[in-house]
Amino acid sequence: AGCQQFLPEGITLDEFKSTEINPNVGIMQSQKVGPAIADDITQSAVWAVLAALLGIFLYVLARFRNFAFSVGALTGLAHNTLIVLGAYALLWKVMPFSMEIDQAFIAAILTVIGYSINDTVVIFDRVREYTSLYPKRDRKQNINDALNHTLSRTFSTSMSTLVVLVAIFCFGGETIRGFVFALLIGVVVGTYSSLCVATPLAFDIQEAMDRRKAKKAELKK
């Protein structure tokens, strides 16, 4: 009854839905997105994220020639991805806007991965520079100085990005708020992980590799 006023005169709802009675009036075409298509989209999204992580791992390895840096960067990016996914899972029915896991969300995840690696590479590059300038100095001191000298640059870049994202979130409209919300979380977490996850982990891995080499050298003697 509620839809009758929108139907052509003399056409019932059943006649409108039927494609056999009058093919020129009514529902001309309909499609259903079934579980098979949804599974295909999910699988493609997972492969896209894994391909991005693998590509960045190989890029860092080729640029710095250091396995510890590659593992540290990859762990930081995986950490960022899981935090964004966890935030969406926790706040899915809490936030007053759409937070569906769709193509826009996957695009946000890939954007966060690309943004986060930028800060990490800058820090790693400064660590490599200090290691070349002061090869005899303690590695921990070189990493600490690298973090201190890139801290202002990291925070300035992140804050300018956050200001833009907050403006888009507030005034950009309802349809993109879920996408921008994922970026907001990703930028904050990515800044933290570059400073407090990727770099310290790279240091720990390098120290462990050095200890293993020292033990092997002692055994050969």
Regions found by a protein language model. Give the residues of each.
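A structural signal for conserved, well-ordered secondary-structure elements
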Residues: 1-221
